[in-house]
Amino acid sequence: MFYADGILRKSSLIDEIPGIFHGFSTRFGGKSTLSHTASLNLSHDLGDSADIVRENFEIFARTISGGVYGGNATVTLHQIHSAKVRVLTRENAGEGYSIPRGEDGDGFVTADSGVIPVARAADCVPILLAGLRADGNPVVSAVHAGWRGTVAGIAAEAVRVMESLGCERPTIRAAIGPHIGYCCYEVGADFYETVCGLCGTEFAGRHITIPDGKAKHHANLTSMNAEILGNAGIAAEKIDISPDCTMCMSDVYYSHRATGGKRGVHGAGIGIL
């Protein structure tokens, strides 16, 4: 179950994994004063000064970690709507904050403390995962799943990379964070045809349908990612799903569609104590 914790949204399933911290940010609690980025914008490319964005990362990192880590532990990357997942070590801490970003991609996995992977979104799907190795130590992941990354299977790729670091699949919990819901995600026929070509007509038919009273198809990124995680071996009861639609709740979250692209971005961060 998702719940509010001050300016954050959290997953009770992720909380079950000991020795970690996590959180999905909202628009609240930051230093941005521009109308479209107020107030916890986590992007340097949307109008805020570099100093303000750095302050926002500092707030976010300290809030999710309970004051243990600051912004210099965070890592972001240039997200490219792919299924590419990077392995991080504590030596990567600060990429995108105080030192240049590393290679492009859309997800992170780490088994190290001292580094906070942050996936960023403003309608796309942020996913956090956590599990344990046989020795009881945690492995965590943060993923940005746009529709292209979703159908390319980035959620399953994150599970695979976690296992490559020794994480035991039965221990993995996943939290699908706030994103644009089926209610608002209208798509065209070309979108449907593209997903059919990539994932098959049965998959597309399950997740891209025309709602009652609507004229066009809507895509369900929630159910797509839940199915992909299930096919990767994550049991349904270990997948937490936020009920919040970023477009419906654009006063709480940043939404690209609700604002015509004039917005900030929020973050999904996770780390090891």
Q: Which residues are covered by each model-predicted region?
A:
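Active-site microenvironment for binding and transforming phosphate-containing groups
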Residues: M1-L273
